[in-house]
């Protein structure tokens, strides 16, 4: 089983301009994400897929492997599917470029179902939330996941799901962690499918898989590692890195 990590990276971002090149204690954000990915023990190769020469240049200067992709991709998974067509591998991880604190163990965790019996079409990660963590549950920028008893995804939503008509203290909500692993054929099938109705409604690419009958195995992680979507996120990550450098 040959696993490859693909990191989609576009320069423009609606909430944080040119965030992939934002400085994080002396290194661009995308470089820190790539360095963390290189520490995975299950993946044999790490490739950044981008449509930006600015991003490609800063990575290539540091020895990273980069593939240039079309600017027309509607989502990160379409971008990595384009790159994967010319890359040998059995399973591909879609690791977002804005995850500079991602743990190599977390990457290996999302890959783990593919190294076990009965691998899924796709795997992803979820993080448990308590019912009283209402701010996160109600935040539309935090995607919630519904799981069946076998750990497969039933649905993903920006809304609080399930709706709590009755008080159920033992109910666990799951926050989706946006990293995926795909079997090679499933990744290409995903890219060939049109944007689905629910995907467009929620602006969640993983719903394209569910609407078309593919399975998504959800692996529970206990590591809460912040990504970078806003200026506030960027400052949080900078403060974490400063603390780590002093320890």
UniProtKB/Swiss-Prot annotation:
It comes from the Bacteria. Keywords: Cytoplasm, Lipopolysaccharide biosynthesis, Nucleotidyltransferase, Transferase. One of its GO terms (molecular function) is 3-deoxy-manno-octulosonate cytidylyltransferase activity. It catalyses: 3-deoxy-alpha-D-manno-oct-2-ulosonate + CTP = CMP-3-deoxy-beta-D-manno-octulosonate + diphosphate. It is found in: Cytoplasm. Coiled coil: none annotated. One of its GO terms (biological process) is lipopolysaccharide biosynthetic process. It is an enzyme of class 2 (transferase). Its EC number is 2.7.7.38. Gene3D superfamilies: Spore Coat Polysaccharide Biosynthesis Protein SpsA, Chain A. Pathway: Nucleotide-sugar biosynthesis; CMP-3-deoxy-D-manno-octulosonate biosynthesis; CMP-3-deoxy-D-manno-octulosonate from 3-deoxy-D-manno-octulosonate and CTP: step 1/1; Bacterial outer membrane biogenesis; lipopolysaccharide biosynthesis. CDD domains: CMP-KDO-Synthetase. One of its GO terms (cellular component) is cytosol. Belongs to the KdsB family. Activates KDO (a required 8-carbon sugar) for incorporation into bacterial lipopolysaccharide in Gram-negative bacteria. This is 3-deoxy-manno-octulosonate cytidylyltransferase. It comes from Chlorobium phaeovibrioides (strain DSM 265 / 1930) (Prosthecochloris vibrioformis (strain DSM 265)). The gene is kdsB.
């Amino acid at each position: 089983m040959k696993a490859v990590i693909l990191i989609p990276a576009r320069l423009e971002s609606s909430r944080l301009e040119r965030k992939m090149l934002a400085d994080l204690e002396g290194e661009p954000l995308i470089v820190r994400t790539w360095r963390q990915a290189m520490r995975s023990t299950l993946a044999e190769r790490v490739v950044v897929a981008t449509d930006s020469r600015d991003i490609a240049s800063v990575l290539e200067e540091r020895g990273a492997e980069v593939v240039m992709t079309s600017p027309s991709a509607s989502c990160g998974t379409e971008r990595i599917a384009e790159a994967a067509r010319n890359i040998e591998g059995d399973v591909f991880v879609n690791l977002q470029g804005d995850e500079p604190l991602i743990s190599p163990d977390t990457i290996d965790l999302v890959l783990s179902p593919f190294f076990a019996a009965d691998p899924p079409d796709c795997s992803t990660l979820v993080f448990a939330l308590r019912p009283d963590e209402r701010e996160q549950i109600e935040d539309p920028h935090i995607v919630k996941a519904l799981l069946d008893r076998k750990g497969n995804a039933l649905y993903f939503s920006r809304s609080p799901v399930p709706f709590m008509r009755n008080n159920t203290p033992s109910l666990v909500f799951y926050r989706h962690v946006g990293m995926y692993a795909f079997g090679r054929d499933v990744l290409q099938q995903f890219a060939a499918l049109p944007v689905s109705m629910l995907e467009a409604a929620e602006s969640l690419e993983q719903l394209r898989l569910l609407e078309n009958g593919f399975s998504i195995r959800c692996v529970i992680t206990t590591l809460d590692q912040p990504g970078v979507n806003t200026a506030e996120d960027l400052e949080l990550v900078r403060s974490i890195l400063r603390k780590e450098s002093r320890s």
